[in-house]
Amino acid sequence: MVDVRTQTLLAQLRQQGIRDERLLQAMEAVPREHFIDEAFEHKAYDNTALPIGLGQTISQPYIVARMTELLALWPESRVLEIGTGSGYQTAILAHLVKHVCSVERIKKLQWQAKRRLKLLDLHNISTRHGDGWQGWLSRGPFDAIIVTAAPPEIPQALMAQLDEGGVMVLPVGDEQQHLTRVRRKGGEFVVDTVEAVRFVPLVKGELA
């Protein structure tokens, strides 16, 4: 059965320039309403960010798609996500690559996301409660790193965990934030500014 809301959202994403069909298929397969509170279920397929509690949000579908597309993933990519949040972005990634590592600083959110992902029968994901600024050193290096909260500057620890030829996509800034792509080439880092965005801040440390 075709879900009209999903198809409408996918059409909007195509109009906004999203071209990766594998990505669009993944977004079609992942039920966004599974990752939000019942009070916001009627807005699950609106192209907007929604609150998930504890001062955090589930990102606007366009931003999820844009950031994922910029990673230029292939099935064998080793991916690190900083900021598991609701688990929605994690689920999209899990449909595209063999394995995803995801770090969340808020224990309650990490537990909730882990439960949701298990209910969707997604088992190619490792989650960890920890400080996103530090990444996940023992699992690196990574071909792709996606950061779903905004640090004021690019964390050096994450740059160090990016493999040769790898790509990191993240929002950077305080009051004025810009979606940024970092590519590691021959031991150097090429940094590109993509577009203006608005994210919650990437807070240091972890919260029980």
Swiss-Prot record:
Enzyme Commission code: 2.1.1.77
Active site: S59
Database matches in InterPro entries: PCMT (IPR000682), SAM-dependent_MTases_sf (IPR029063)
HAMAP family: PIMT
Subcellular location, principal: cytoplasm
Entry annotated with the keyword Protease: no
UniProt GO molecular function: protein-L-isoaspartate (D-aspartate) O-methyltransferase activity
Catalysed reactions, as listed in the record: [protein]-L-isoaspartate + S-adenosyl-L-methionine = [protein]-L-isoaspartate alpha-methyl ester + S-adenosyl-L-homocysteine
Top EC class of this enzyme: transferase
PROSITE patterns in the cross-refs: PCMT (PS01279)
Record-stated family: Belongs to the methyltransferase superfamily. L-isoaspartyl/D-aspartyl protein methyltransferase family.
Record has Acetylation as a keyword: no
UniProt-recorded name of the protein: Protein-L-isoaspartate O-methyltransferase
Compartment list: Cytoplasm
Keyword list, A-Z: Cytoplasm, Methyltransferase, S-adenosyl-L-methionine, Transferase
Coiled-coil zones: none
Superkingdom of source: Bacteria
GO cellular component, one term: cytoplasm
Gene: pcm
UniProt GO BP: methylation; protein modification process; protein repair
Role played: Catalyzes the methyl esterification of L-isoaspartyl residues in peptides and proteins that result from spontaneous decomposition of normal L-aspartyl and L-asparaginyl residues. It plays a role in the repair and/or degradation of damaged proteins.
